[in-house]
């Protein structure tokens, strides 16, 4: 019986190792001719190695700068861009991408290194147009690790992390303690990158987050005490954008750049 149980356990681990993309990423696919419901954005795809990323750009006259937005692990740009009122309020443009296999983006996610390379390519496609103006790197959930890694290599004026993780390995350990963390091919070590970030950092995290516990944000804040850390009372993981405290704090911080 012990041998059988061991064989089953080993088989499950092998399956998890090779199929973990299906456990980490939950894209919504869109047809290539899909028309986005938000009318005041333009499509601006980004060519990357072996694929093309769907991206949306909201631009307004005399913008103060740009919010470079990296979203979470589910949905598509159709769900992530529901309006531009916040950006009009703060005077900032928006540039947001769908990862490979999300929305209208082609290809599929194959490695963490590939994701970082894609994010950097997207950055290089837009950032030069905002030279001399303020740029905000914004990461939400999955996007927080990607944004933090990018922030170690580029010049911007603020890094915003919404519902961040110390690492995806730590998140996996929270939910699947029986799985050896070394098997995760997407460790996304925010805890290693954040101390290397030179720009100001704002962290907002829901106190009731049931997906990425607030302990992750607390750990990051302890690593870099100079970060501004805001606990969102009564807020879970998927309702952050509905929090008045979140919207007001973000608008204040970005608007004062």
Q: Which positions does each model-derived feature cover?
A:
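An N-terminal hydrophobic leader/cap segment in hydrolases
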Residues: 5-47
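Membrane-embedded segments
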Residues: 52-125, 133
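Alpha/beta-hydrolase fold nucleophile elbow
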Residues: 130-141
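Active-site nucleophile loop of the alpha/beta-hydrolase fold
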Residues: 156, 160-170, 186, 190, ...
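Short beta-strand/loop motif that positions the catalytic acidic residue
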Residues: 197-198, 203-205, 209
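Conserved alpha/beta-hydrolase "acid-adjacent" motif
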Residues: 210-216
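Catalytic histidine-centered segment of alpha/beta-hydrolase-like enzymes
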Residues: 235-245
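Catalytic active-site module of serine/aspartate enzymes centered on a nucleophile-bearing elbow/loop
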Residues: 243-257
